[in-house]
């Protein structure tokens, strides 16, 4: 489909004034707004997609539909908030001294001064309201994803169309004392990845560590197109077809200069630019509350995961976004000869 329209620009609509959180470096805010679904960007994207699926297409097509929610700000009409009364919510897991066993560079790197902290949310009583706003946003977008899928299922393309649902990043909703995406921990890098395809196994759930880099090779493979040797990812078609469990796969996340996390089926290993480390066992510690990096019993695990680290990290350049998230990033830019842009 050689036209653009499946992603409306911006993160709005926005009220005239923020409801709770006021910062010029983040969209973070929450509350009931606007009054109607029709005023939401995602509603317009969904309607565009439905229109495209109702058209006749005489050749294969690719249709991308970009939904904003549950990206901040967590605004949605009242009916979506009503589905999640604050007094009935279960709060995300939070440990007050969670970061006591991580290296100093981890605390410096992960500091996000423009975002709310969980301590602040607890003290002000806003945490249930934040979670309500987040869940309202999820319910809203879930409904309109469903509207697009219903349009597909009612179209002539229902039986020969591959559907992939994914998110570009995760989010901390109070875990690790933050409401942010900026981290090398699980909540930031774990994203939805759902594939519905002809020949796939219905209802199958895989615990394999996969990456968004795998999406393009997967779609090439499923569409019967030639593989591209330049792609770093690997096709997930064997996993979707139930032919492979995906054992031995790894996914990497990077944040800042030369800081990387490796996620396998069981462990997450983080190594920072100064050599400091974190290691978490997701079988026994899904909340990543116990850093095992200094435990000699896990030396072999660290060594195995470290083999997945890149041989080198790309240098920062003047075209790098210079907005400093925190003091650590500002210093990192200066060491690279780049004057950081710092917003107040």
Tell where the protein language model's regions lie, with residue ranges:
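C-terminal, low-complexity/hydrophilic appendages and adjacent surface loops
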Residues: 186-187, 251-294, 329-344
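A long, amphipathic alpha-helix that forms part
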Residues: 40-54, 118-161, 222
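A short beta-strand-to-alpha-helix junction
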Residues: 100-101, 128-139, 183-191, 200-217, ...
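Histidine-centered active-site microenvironments of extracellular/periplasmic hydrolases
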Residues: 73-76, 150-204, 211
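Formylglycine-dependent
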Residues: 1-78, 115-124
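Short catalytic/ligand-binding loop motif for oxyanion handling, primarily in non-cytosolic enzymes
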Residues: 60-61, 69-76, 172-175, 179-182, ...
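Polar, surface-exposed loop/tail segments
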Residues: 31-34, 38-50, 61, 73, ...
């Amino acid at each position: 489909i050689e036209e653009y329209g499946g992603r409306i620009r911006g993160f709005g609509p926005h009220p005239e004034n923020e409801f709770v959180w006021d910062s010029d470096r983040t969209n973070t805010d929450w509350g009931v707004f606007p009054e109607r679904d029709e005023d939401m960007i995602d509603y317009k994207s969904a309607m565009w997609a439905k229109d495209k699926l109702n058209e006749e297409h005489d050749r294969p097509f690719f249709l991308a539909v970009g939904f904003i929610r549950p990206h901040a700000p967590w605004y949605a009409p009242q009916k979506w908030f009503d589905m999640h009364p604050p007094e009935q919510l279960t709060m995300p897991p939070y440990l007050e001294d969670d970061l006591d066993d991580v290296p100093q560079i981890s605390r410096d790197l992960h500091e996000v001064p423009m975002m709310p902290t969980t301590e602040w949310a607890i003290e002000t009583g806003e945490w249930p309201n934040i979670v309500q706003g987040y869940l309202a946003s999820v319910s809203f977008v879930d409904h309109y994803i469903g509207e697009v899928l219903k349009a597909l299922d009612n179209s002539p393309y229902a039986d020969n169309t591959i559907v992939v649902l994914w998110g570009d990043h995760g989010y901390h909703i109070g875990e690790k004392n933050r409401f942010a995406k900026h981290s090398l921990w699980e909540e930031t890098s774990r994203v939805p990845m759902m594939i519905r395809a002809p020949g796939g196994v219905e209802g199958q759930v895989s615990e394999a560590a996969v990456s968004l880099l795998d999406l393009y090779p997967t779609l090439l493979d499923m569409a019967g197109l030639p593989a591209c040797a330049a792609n770093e990812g690997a096709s997930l078609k064997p996993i979707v077809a139930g032919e492979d469990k995906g054992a031995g796969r790894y996914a990497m996340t990077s944040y800042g200069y030369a800081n990387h996390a490796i996620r396998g089926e069981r462990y997450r290993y983080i190594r920072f630019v100064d050599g400091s480390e974190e290691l978490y066992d997701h079988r026994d510690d899904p909340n990543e509350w116990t850093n095992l990096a200094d435990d000699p019993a896990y030396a072999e695990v660290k060594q195995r995961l470290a083999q997945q680290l890149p041989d080198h990290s790309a240098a920062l350049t003047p075209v790098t976004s210079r907005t400093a998230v925190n003091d650590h990033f500002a210093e990192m830019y200066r060491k690279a000869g780049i004057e950081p842009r710092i917003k107040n």
